[in-house]
Amino acid sequence: MAIMSDKWIKDAVMNQNMIRPFAAKQVRVHNKEKIISYGLSSYGYDARVSNEFKIFTNINSTTVDPKNFSEYNLVDREVDACIIPPNSFALGRTIEYFKIPRDVLVICVGKSTYARCGIIVNVTPLEPEWEGHVTLEFSNTTPLPAKIYANEGACQFLFLKSDQICDTSYAERQGKYMKQVGVTLPLT
């Protein structure tokens, strides 16, 4: 597997509609204000988080159970900036919609701006022929409230191209998160 360059990413966007909307260069300023960057980078794509968040709460004193997940664990917010409580967790989603080629696996890493503030983003791999908005998992590892800015860069996706096409893609095995739109909760 090889990591793919900005040139390959641009070609995949133009020929396979891999990312939409797509920013062909790094965007660092919006309306004359500095923002957390997003867009095409040398060997990846920095995606934005939308204004749709689900923040974990203990108001209802429920248990977080991945096999029987309750929406009572969360508070929904549509905001320009999401405040994550100390040592807590929130879900968001990318603005960008991804369509992954059959011979590509995508991994996500955090942005240093957030990581240096104790905010960690986690995403499981985007598998061959998966498509949808990516649900982003944000952890606030600090003892203080932490802020995530909507419509700004949140994470970077790295595209790994295989030298061999997989026998069965995510679409063919009818993965449960196929074509997800919005913040998607755990499914079993």
Curated annotation (Swiss-Prot):
Its EC number is 3.5.4.13. One of its GO terms (molecular function) is nucleotide binding. GO terms for biological process: dUMP biosynthetic process; dUTP biosynthetic process. InterPro entries: dCTP_deaminase, dUTPase-like_sf, dUTPase_trimeric. It comes from the Bacteria. It catalyses: dCTP + H2O + H(+) = dUTP + NH4(+). Pathway: Pyrimidine metabolism; dUMP biosynthesis; dUMP from dCTP (dUTP route): step 1/2. It holds the Pfam family DCD. Coiled coil: none annotated. DCTP binds at K111, S112, T113, Y114, A115, R116, T135, L136, E137, Q156, Y170, K179, Q180. Keywords: Hydrolase, Nucleotide metabolism, Nucleotide-binding. The active site is at E137 (proton donor/acceptor). Catalyzes the deamination of dCTP to dUTP. Homotrimer. HAMAP family: dCTP_deaminase. Belongs to the dCTP deaminase family. This is dCTP deaminase. It comes from Rickettsia prowazekii (strain Madrid E). The lineage of its organism: Bacteria, Pseudomonadati, Pseudomonadota, Alphaproteobacteria, Rickettsiales.
